């Protein structure tokens, strides 16, 4: 990848430890794209709030933040023995788990941290604490490798669909980019890998849905892709059908927050309508997801908890003045579920899964 893009990735790293390893150093995504500011989180309350307020967001990045959050805050636990330490650790885990309900990576990462502590329980508490830092580092490093694999597989699909001399049109929703992960993103990974494999930014034309109400597409995806030199167009969510009808979109890539075992996939609100449109216009619709996003305990989309957020995000946020009457009832779910039969494939790091998804997940040992 070219140096400028690598430098950009370095500048916007979502989550890392402070050099003293006593806190989380995150880029505050609520300030992007106007202000690129890193902030430090030390207490469990600061970490909880940063996740809740979307200062750090996107399923894999939330998992990494929670893992480091557990390591950093567990380091301060004063306990006589493992049993007392473990009790305090589980309290931290349960508290961080209550920050957001939908992205399963949060619970997956927290469980992995708990399991690591249990695996070390015969050792000294200092060793257990050090192991928690090691596990969080590992979760972060694995995420880079996982999204790279997703990118390779997605790039394979782009190569098949691309016509000589024409940019391939890709539509994406929300931000499943570098800002949502530890490096390549999931939905953006095929684009970044395309650059690594020698494509020019003009070989692709990425259409970013603005993504109401929190504008992750406009503020974050368009920001990253413009930095990468990829031809990028931003449209409001209700403009996607016009683009699809005109033949400009050849493939859709989105991320996701939780996949049920039958393939139903929860992602940012509005994803389901993109999938319905894609089906109508005969455009392949792919979900890009690390296998940690597949929740084997969840039979179908009806069992995925959907986060409801504040009405203010719809009525007044981003506006100079309130744009809806006081007291109006507001519907503001943060996610929706795309039915599995609308999904062409789910690209995981282990392979591309097709319907019946449960069989493919089993085949790939997910
Ligand atoms: O509310 P957000 O911004 O955390 O929602 C993010 C998404 O919906 C992403 O598409 C998803 O987490 C996948 S990120 C690789």
List where the protein language model places each region.
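Small-aliphatic-rich amphipathic alpha-helix that forms the alpha element of a beta-alpha
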Residues: 49-56, 62, 273-276
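Acidic-glycine-rich active-site phosphate/pyrophosphate-binding loop
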Residues: 35-46, 127, 164-168, 221, ...
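Conserved phosphate- and dinucleotide-binding cores of soluble alpha/beta proteins
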Residues: 203-204, 210-366
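Short, hydrophobic/aliphatic alpha-helical segments
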Residues: 39-55, 89, 168-172, 317-327
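Short beta-strand segments
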Residues: 27, 65, 107-109, 171-175, ...
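Short, glycine-rich nucleotide/cofactor-binding loops
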Residues: 40-44, 175-181, 261-266
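N-terminal active-site beta-alpha-beta segment that forms phosphate/nucleotide-binding
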Residues: 55-232
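Positively charged, low-complexity intrinsically disordered leader regions
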Residues: 2-45
